[in-house]
Swiss-Prot record:
<keyword id="KW-0647">Proteasome</keyword>
<dbReference type="GO" id="GO:0019773">
    <property type="term" value="C:proteasome core complex, alpha-subunit complex"/>
</dbReference>
<dbReference type="GO" id="GO:0010498">
    <property type="term" value="P:proteasomal protein catabolic process"/>
</dbReference>
<protein>
    <recommendedName>
        <fullName>Proteasome subunit alpha</fullName>
    </recommendedName>
</protein>
<dbReference type="InterPro" id="IPR001353">
    <property type="entry name" value="Proteasome_sua/b"/>
</dbReference>
<dbReference type="Pfam" id="PF00227">
    <property type="entry name" value="Proteasome"/>
</dbReference>
<comment type="pathway">
    <text>Protein degradation; proteasomal Pup-dependent pathway.</text>
</comment>
<dbReference type="InterPro" id="IPR023332">
    <property type="entry name" value="Proteasome_alpha-type"/>
</dbReference>
<dbReference type="InterPro" id="IPR029055">
    <property type="entry name" value="Ntn_hydrolases_N"/>
</dbReference>
<dbReference type="GO" id="GO:0004298">
    <property type="term" value="F:threonine-type endopeptidase activity"/>
</dbReference>
<feature type="region of interest" description="Disordered">
    <location>
        <begin position="226"/>
        <end position="259"/>
    </location>
</feature>
<dbReference type="GO" id="GO:0019941">
    <property type="term" value="P:modification-dependent protein catabolic process"/>
</dbReference>
<feature type="compositionally biased region" description="Low complexity">
    <location>
        <begin position="227"/>
        <end position="250"/>
    </location>
</feature>
<keyword id="KW-0963">Cytoplasm</keyword>
<comment type="function">
    <text>Component of the proteasome core, a large protease complex with broad specificity involved in protein degradation.</text>
</comment>
<comment type="similarity">
    <text>Belongs to the peptidase T1A family.</text>
</comment>
<dbReference type="InterPro" id="IPR022296">
    <property type="entry name" value="Proteasome_asu_bac"/>
</dbReference>
Amino acid sequence: MSMPFGYVSPEQQMRDKADYARKGIARGRSVVVLQYEHGILFVAPNPSRALHKISEIYDRIGFAAVGRYNEFEALRLGGIRYADINGYNYARDDVTARGLANLYAQNLGQIFTESMKPFEVEIVVAEVGDSSDEDHIYRLTFDGSVFDETGLVAMGGQAEAVAGRLKERYRDGLPLAEALEAALFALTEPGGERSPASQLEVAVLDRNRPHRKFLRLAGPRLERLLAEGSATSATSATPGEAEAPATAPEGDVDTGSNG
């Protein structure tokens, strides 16, 4: 039996949608999310002061995204409504990053399967716990796939390269300034210039803050952290002991000449 003219198999449709979404996401600049000494850090190059890639969802939960702003903004607002309703009807502690990740996975999966155009987004939902072992970082892709990340995650354009550079500097329990320095090192291409503080969007989920854990870092506070992280990086790059200068060997030197 011959296929009708213009027929596209479901498998090919899914591949085409996935390629389309990946290309759209890759055009955006990367965002990194990583654990630090007292919580979870979010860092994104973002020259816009009005359009945020990083936001608060609920008391202990943060949100970061790359891709089309109008699409991930719709997801963010939907997540806030979900959190507010569940926190009001039940208890605030019942609102979790896992629940939000499941909600987003269902929405993204349905859109990817049923719509002609998939969402060109990749998002992270993170929740800070009472200790680092209780922190949760979930990454969701355009088709609704969910990944439970540990320690760090990079998404957006050149995500693999950014994640590789971040792993070079990352370790458990980094102080905030050093974690920020590691994030900026990862987000800066080799030989490239770092984004100035005015073009960075930085926020934390700080487990030591009462009630709402989300805090944006900007202005003088961000400048101080950047200076501290840069100074720490320069100090660690300096060898602890200077190498001893080369000295001539003791005794007579054979020059290769006779006499």
